[in-house]
């Protein structure tokens, strides 16, 4: 039996060997919404430019940006006596090997694991840690809840977009979103990282929740670290342009964002 999860959809699946194999096994593919980067795209980015890293910035990790990853985690082995485990993340488009830092020591992989560090393997060469928080169930689906690239100047913007995606992916609102706003704290155990909380009222209607989340994402976006056009791109499937313009005008009136001089700027950026 295949251990791969039916996660993701590849428009070029006809040319994808792993996708063809899945089709042969009659395992259906599931379309993941929005602009997803699936595993084959991550691998492709790494292979096309494996030397893209420079200093602390690993350019090909950009394949993770805006990612929704729904994959199956397969346990491979423990690494000596360390709290690290080696595993494989697979979806319908391919697989990558990962090294995961377990939340606590145990003889076996717990039923649920909070993983905080993932080390990507590219053709046997290990690269700098990618930090993430994953909720995973052994041999089951795994959902990316939190993502950042260590020592990357654009880390905060990825957090914000990730929050948007996480919210839109879920059927119900979440009371509290949280992400780090001080990337130095990742590498300084004594630093107190600032956190921004996006408070979502579960009693609100879904549309109102989405509007409120969009408002807060825009508000906590100093110097437009996330291009507004990208933020709106992810909300357009949930909101119409009239609703978007209404909330933008509210933010401008409240001096929470700068006026851009055009109601349609988001479509023209």
From Swiss-Prot:
InterPro entries assigned: NA-bd_OB-fold
This protein's record includes keyword Iron: no
Molecular function GO terms recorded: DNA binding
Keywords assigned by UniProt, alphabetized: Chromosome, DNA-binding, Nucleus, Telomere
Region (Disordered): 1-25
Gene: RPA2
Name of the featured protein: Replication protein A 32 kDa subunit
Cellular localization per UniProt: Nucleus; Chromosome, Telomere
Statement: the UniProt record of this protein carries the keyword DNA-binding: yes
Regions of compositional bias (Polar residues) in chain numbering: 1-22
Role summary: Component of the heterotrimeric replication protein A (RPA) and holoenzyme telomerase ribonucleoprotein complexes. As part of the RPA complex, binds and stabilizes single-stranded DNA (ssDNA) intermediates, that form during DNA replication or upon DNA stress. It prevents their reannealing and in parallel, recruits and activates different proteins and complexes involved in DNA metabolism. Thereby, it plays an essential role both in DNA replication and the cellular response to DNA damage.
DNA-binding region: 69-149
Main subcellular location of this protein, as a coarse class: nucleus
Quaternary organization: Component of the replication protein A complex (RPA), a heterotrimeric complex composed of RPA1, RPA2/TEB2 and RPA3/TEB3. Component of the telomerase holoenzyme complex, composed of the catalytic core (the catalytic subunit TERT, the telomerase RNA template component TER and TAP65/p65), which is associated with two heterotrimeric subcomplexes: (i) the replication protein A (RPA)-related subcomplex, composed of TEB1, RPA2/TEB2 and RPA3/TEB3 and (ii) the CST-like subcomplex, composed of TAP75/p75, TAP45/p45 and TAP19/p19.
GO cellular component: chromosome, telomeric region; DNA replication factor A complex; telomerase holoenzyme complex
Family (UniProt): Belongs to the replication factor A protein 2 family.
